[in-house]
């Protein structure tokens, strides 16, 4: 029978539940157990697909095309599992489903209430994931903070699950913050109150994960255990660490993995975390620093590009390179020009995005990389920007643009996909999820992947306009990846360049620690080689003494 672990948060938001859940999943998987994960988000949006990145951060796209919370990216990277749309549930989805059933008459004229109808729908979604995944353990993170009014139906649903599946098949983990005051003393009172608030909705925490910026001694653990009525072994200190990939080892060294297995009666094998320990050891080693510019629209909020950031670090780690990300606002490039902002970097990355703001800065960055031989990686919109830049400055064609930014442009080298023309709703209507791409032999993309066909995740409405394909190819643009039906250009590149590759898809969503994505691996390697070549040119000549 599937076991369930429910993870709640207290004291403050953004306390680290997502990394905690991902780390717990890693500990269980290292013991030979199959794990699936779910995020319950209490907002009324159906999904984050139409939310501003400033509000929500990155939209993570699953293989089956769901637009989900960025925490699903952490889950996939830590546990090395591909999740589905079943793994992200919002209040908006729950209420939409219940109201649709009421309109169909499924409730036979009954009065629709939060209890039981909303809570039953929540439990049904959790059960669907368990049945679909057939996982030994399903870990469910409840978004928000205990005490938020939006979270109450979810808390009530997971309270009811204790009776539905049996007390021995459930664990409740509460993640809290231990703040410290000017004297340096860690304060436990907020955690005590948070545990009490959880009890007020009928849930008693089995395990307390205590976040803090400084060490938590045994006296504090015993105090929390006393007030929370848990075993002192169940009070787990989680100090702030240099890398999120250290967290599974912190939890393992505190005995959490064995404690979970013991409490849930899981048929686990001894933990195998040797590869993970080797990964963390590589993270701690001194590495050559390579500056890479990320030119984007939302650079003030790094979480808007979290999968891109992690994919860069995965590739750097494999090659003993410390990626020094230079966050460059595309609007700044428009105002000040690319030369001043990009002259000190050895790689330029333009990630995905939407909207006209900053677009000319992204196009200028793509062209600057082309002219100056700086390795370039374009993702989704970054590929479209590279195409526009090439058409403008290599072909010398005037009034070139995407119809997203100028519907009346004379030369729409990027245009709305035909099947998008009659769509009026924004949410969930793009080309989303995993699609195949055929790679052209003899190209950088083919060499990077080492195969003829790949499958990658997409999120876009606009595409390369095939009306311009022949003229662009004649001018030197290489189409190195294309859909099997030959209609959609997936990858473009340049031949006589250290690395100039751009994809319509989002390779960052499939990068993993220890298994970097091939395009990021190639990009980072080219950036490092460019740095080394530059250093070699600057070395002083040494006269021979012979």
Swiss-Prot record:
ATP binds at residues 14-19, 71. Residues 1-266 are annotated as: Amidoligase domain. Its EC number is 6.3.4.2. One of its GO terms (molecular function) is CTP synthase activity. UTP binds at residues 13, 187-192, 223. It comes from the Bacteria. Allosterically activated by GTP, when glutamine is the substrate; GTP has no effect on the reaction when ammonia is the substrate. The allosteric effector GTP functions by stabilizing the protein conformation that binds the tetrahedral intermediate(s) formed during glutamine hydrolysis. Inhibited by the product CTP, via allosteric rather than competitive inhibition. The active site is at residues 380, 506, 508. It catalyses: UTP + L-glutamine + ATP + H2O = CTP + L-glutamate + ADP + phosphate + 2 H(+); L-glutamine + H2O = L-glutamate + NH4(+); UTP + NH4(+) + ATP = CTP + ADP + phosphate + 2 H(+). Coiled coil: none annotated. GO terms for cellular component: cytosol. Keywords: ATP-binding, Glutamine amidotransferase, Ligase, Magnesium, Metal-binding, Nucleotide-binding, Pyrimidine biosynthesis. CDD domains: CTPS_N, GATase1_CTP_Synthase. Catalyzes the ATP-dependent amination of UTP to CTP with either L-glutamine or ammonia as the source of nitrogen. Regulates intracellular CTP levels through interactions with the four ribonucleotide triphosphates. HAMAP family: PyrG (MF_01227). CTPSs have evolved a hybrid strategy for distinguishing between UTP and CTP. The overlapping regions of the product feedback inhibitory and substrate sites recognize a common feature in both compounds, the triphosphate moiety. To differentiate isosteric substrate and product pyrimidine rings, an additional pocket far from the expected kinase/ligase catalytic site, specifically recognizes the cytosine and ribose portions of the product inhibitor. This is CTP synthase. It comes from Chloroflexus aurantiacus (strain ATCC 29366 / DSM 635 / J-10-fl). The gene is pyrG.
């Amino acid at each position: 029978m599937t076991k369930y672990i429910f993870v709640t948060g207290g004291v403050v938001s953004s306390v680290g539940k997502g990394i905690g859940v991902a780390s717990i999943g890693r500990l269980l998987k290292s013991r030979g157990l199959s794990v699936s994960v779910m995020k319950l988000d209490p907002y009324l949006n159906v999904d984050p697909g139409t939310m501003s990145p400033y509000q929500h951060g990155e939209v993570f796209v699953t293989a089956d095309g769901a637009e989900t919370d960025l925490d699903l990216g952490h889950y996939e990277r830590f546990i090395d599992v591909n999740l589905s749309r079943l793994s992200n549930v919002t209040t908006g989805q729950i209420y939409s489903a219940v109201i649709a059933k009421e309109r169909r008459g499924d409730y036979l004229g009954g009065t629709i209430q939060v209890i039981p109808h909303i809570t039953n729908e929540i439990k049904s979604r959790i059960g669907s994931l368990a049945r679909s995944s057939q996982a030994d353990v399903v870990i469910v993170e409840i978004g928000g903070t205990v005490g938020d009014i939006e979270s109450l139906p979810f808390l009530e649903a997971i309270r009811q699950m204790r009776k539905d599946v049996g007390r021995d098949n459930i664990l409740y983990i509460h993640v809290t913050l231990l703040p410290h005051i000017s004297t340096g003393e860690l304060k436990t009172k907020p955690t005590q109150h948070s545990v009490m608030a959880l009890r007020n909705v009928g849930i008693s925490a089995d395990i307390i994960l205590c976040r803090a910026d400084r060490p938590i001694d045994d006296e504090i653990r015993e105090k929390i255990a006393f007030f929370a009525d848990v075993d002192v072994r169940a009070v787990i200190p989680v100090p702030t660490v240099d890398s999120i990939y250290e967290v599974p080892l912190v939890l393992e060294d505190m005995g959490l993995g064995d404690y979970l297995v013991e409490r849930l009666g899981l048929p686990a094998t001894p933990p195998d975390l040797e590869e993970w320990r080797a990964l963390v050891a590589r993270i701690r080693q001194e590495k050559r620093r390579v500056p890479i510019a990320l030119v984007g629209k939302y650079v003030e909020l790094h979480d808007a590009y979290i999968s891109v950031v992690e994919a860069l670090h995965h590739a750097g780690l494999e090659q003993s390179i410390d990626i020094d990300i230079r966050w460059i606002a595309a609007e700044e490039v428009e105002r000040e020009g690319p030369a001043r902002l990009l002259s000190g970097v050895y790689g330029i990355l333009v990630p995905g995005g939407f909207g006209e703001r900053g677009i000319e800065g992204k196009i200028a960055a793509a062209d600057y990389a082309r002219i100056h031989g700086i390795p370039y990686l374009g993702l989704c919109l970054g590929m479209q920007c590279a195409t526009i830049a090439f058409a403008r400055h290599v072909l010398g064609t005037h009034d070139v643009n995407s119809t997203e930014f100028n519907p009346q442009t004379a030369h729409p080298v990027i245009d709305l996909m035909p099947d998008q023309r009659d769509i009026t709703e924004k949410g969930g209507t793009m080309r989303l999820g995993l699609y195949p791409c055929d790679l052209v032999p003899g190209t950088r993309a083919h060499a990077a992947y080492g195969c003829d066909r790949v499958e990658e995740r997409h999120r876009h409405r606009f595409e390369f306009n095939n009306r311009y394909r022949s003229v662009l190819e004649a001018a030197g643009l290489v189409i190195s990846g294309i859909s099997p039906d030959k209609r959609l250009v997936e990858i473009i590149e340049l031949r006589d360049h250290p690395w100039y590759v751009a994809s319509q898809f989002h390779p960052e969503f499939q990068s993993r620690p220890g298994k970097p994505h091939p395009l990021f691996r190639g990009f980072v390697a080219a950036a490092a080689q460019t740095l080394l070549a530059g250093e070699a040119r600057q070395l002083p000549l040494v006269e021979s003494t012979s």
